[in-house]
Every structure is written in structure tokens, then in C-alpha cells.
A protein has these predicted regions:
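Non-catalytic cap/lid and distal C-terminal segments of serine-dependent acyl enzymes
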Residues: 1-182
């Protein structure tokens, strides 16, 4: 097919998602530093871990959101608290929920974590896993996707992405390698 996709960050995730959702329709995707494609590493945070928290690591230290040359620029908690001031329509963390979360009262997305404590809602994450975790989708559907998808994903990511997007991308690469994908 002559339909090709590319995108960076959120656009990179969209390119990946479209390619794995419509493998017969699309001829290939070239995502760069896509938003998290494996929720075992969501900006560094394992959303599937028991008692997962987006503000604090298991040792109590803050989860960083952005870095430069190895130095933390901002923590997830500080960034999210600024977003709360803007309201439910503004900000990166809210945008993940608008894309991935089921709809709740009034059509708003169900929050994936408590904005006060940082505690992850495992029921919401189960929905995310079922519907939007790209690596999980490949694991579940590779036998049926292989013929139409193999060799069509051309992922590019560095080793120290500013927003920790490299971790999930490398997990996705490992998933693809484990499946024998080209």
C-alpha cells in the first residue's frame, strides 16, 4: 500500500497505533520517540505494578517527568499539579486520559490516577491495557497480524529521551524481536 505514516511523540504513538490497528490498509510506520507504547514503562513508571503511583517510586522518591543530560527538570507530581490549575482539558497527563481512558459521567475520561495522591486506578489501567497498549496488542494478535504487519514498523528512539519515552520504545522493540518480527 502507498499509505505511509510518520509522527513524533504523541504523533509517533498515533502512527504506531494506526499501523497495528490497520495493518492491511497501511504500508508502514516510521514513529520517532512515540508516547508510551508499552505501559510497563509509562514515562518510566510501570502502570501494571501493584500499588503503582505516578508521583512516587516504591522507595518514595519522586518520578521524574523530564530530564536534560541526566538531571531531572520536573517531577510528574509538580507537572500534574500545574495541569490541575488549567482544568481537565489542558495538559499532557490529561491528554493521555482523553485518548486511552473509558468515558465516565458526562462523557469525560475516567482519570487513570488520583491527582492528590498519585495512586493509579488499576481498573482504568486494565482498560488501557486491553485497548491501547501497543506491545500488548502485538502479543495478543501477532499470529493474525504477522503476514500483514511484519516489516512495517520502523521505530526510532534515542537512549535518553527528555520525557523518558525511550524506555517503552525499547520494550516495544524487545517485544517485536521476541515475536520474530522484522
Amino acid at each position: 500500500s502507498g499509505r505511509l505514516l510518520t509522527g513524533h511523540s504523541s504523533g509517533g504513538w498515533a502512527a504506531l497505533w494506526l499501523q497495528v490497528t490497520y495493518p492491511k490498509l497501511l504500508g508502514g510506520a516510521w514513529p520517532t520517540s512515540p508516547d508510551p507504547s508499552d505501559f510497563h514503562d509509562f514515562l518510566g513508571i510501570n502502570l501494571y505494578a501493584p500499588n503503582a503511583n505516578v508521583y512516587r517510586k516504591p522507595d518514595g522518591t519522586p518520578w521524574p517527568l523530564a530530564r536534560d543530560k541526566g538531571e531531572m527538570l520536573v517531577a510528574v507530581e509538580d507537572f500534574t499539579r500545574r495541569e490541575v490549575v488549567v482544568g481537565e482539558y489542558g495538559g499532557q497527563m490529561a491528554s493521555f486520559e482523553w485518548v486511552f481512558s473509558p468515558r465516565g459521567a458526562g462523557g469525560l475520561p475516567v482519570p487513570m490516577f488520583d491527582r492528590t495522591t498519585g495512586a493509579v486506578d488499576s481498573a482504568v489501567i486494565a482498560y488501557w491495557k486491553e485497548h491501547y497498549d501497543v506491545a500488548e496488542r502485538l502479543h495478543r494478535h501477532w499470529p493474525e497480524f504477522r503476514r500483514d504487519l511484519d516489516g512495517k514498523i520502523h521505530l526510532t528512539v534515542g537512549s535518553a529521551d527528555t520525557f523518558y519515552l525511550d524506555g517503552a520504545a525499547h520494550l516495544l522493540e524487545a517485544t517485536m524481536k521476541g515475536l520474530g518480527a522484522k
